[in-house]
């Protein structure tokens, strides 16, 4: 199996670590806003699975925000997901596609309006893909121990964060089809729980599969 990861991210490193001995996991740094680069990358690797980890965040209150930063967040986080999905479907409509969203896409966050809006769009977009019959999933982690998190929240206690390997484990479960297409899988460090949204009519209210992710010693 070959898993193509878009975005040179820490989560991508976690996926590589999880599959290091059994699966080819190329990571591609192409500009996800460029449909030509995406098309050429998918053609080059012809992957069995695509994971989009590419993302960007700007810390800014709305009053002092710039249009350029807002556009960049929407284009990288949301438009990039759309372009990757469209190109993936055009070559293999049955290929699993996994998009790293965020719990920030489920509610607003101060100083992260553009990021929250873009990730909310990713979650809804993946739901649409699932309803159209495509094998797409979104994963919405809480705090993850990444360089981007450290940039946005310097000095934050790293013990409150998920590891990238834990997020990779949920990617693996999506590949193994333990969830339904269109699902958004929410994982939080608090309580060591994994939550799966199952009620299409009332999102974020009904959950299944509440189970331990591990113990404090392993997290």
Identify the residue ranges that each predicted region occupies:
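Substrate-binding pocket helix/loop in short-chain dehydrogenase/reductase
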Residues: 61-62, 69-71
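Active-site helix of classical SDR
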Residues: 85, 118
């Amino acid at each position: 199996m070959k898993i193509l990861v878009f975005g040179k991210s820490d989560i991508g490193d976690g996926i590589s670590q999880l599959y290091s001995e059994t699966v080819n996991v190329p990571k591609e740094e192409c500009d996800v806003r460029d449909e030509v680069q995406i098309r050429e990358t998918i053609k080059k690797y012809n992957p069995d699975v695509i994971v989009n980890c590419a993302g960007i965040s700007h810390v800014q209150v709305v009053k002092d925000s710039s249009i350029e930063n807002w556009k960049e967040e929407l284009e990288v986080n949301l438009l990039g997901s759309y372009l990757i999905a469209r190109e993936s479907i055009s070559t293999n409509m049955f290929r699993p596609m996994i998009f790293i969203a965020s719990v920030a896409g489920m509610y607003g966050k101060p100083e992260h309006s553009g990021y929250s809006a873009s990730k909310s769009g990713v979650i809804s977009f993946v739901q649409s893909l699932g309803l159209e019959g495509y094998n797409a999933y979104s994963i919405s982690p809480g705090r993850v121990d990444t360089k981007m998190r450290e940039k946005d929240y310097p000095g934050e206690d790293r013990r409150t964060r998920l590891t990238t390997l834990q997020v990779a484990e949920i990617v693996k479960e999506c590949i193994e089809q333990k969830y339904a297409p269109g699902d958004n899988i929410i994982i939080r460090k608090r309580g060591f729980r994994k939550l799966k949204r199952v009620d299409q009519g009332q999102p974020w209210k009904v959950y299944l599969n509440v189970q331990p992710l591990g113990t404090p010693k392993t997290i």
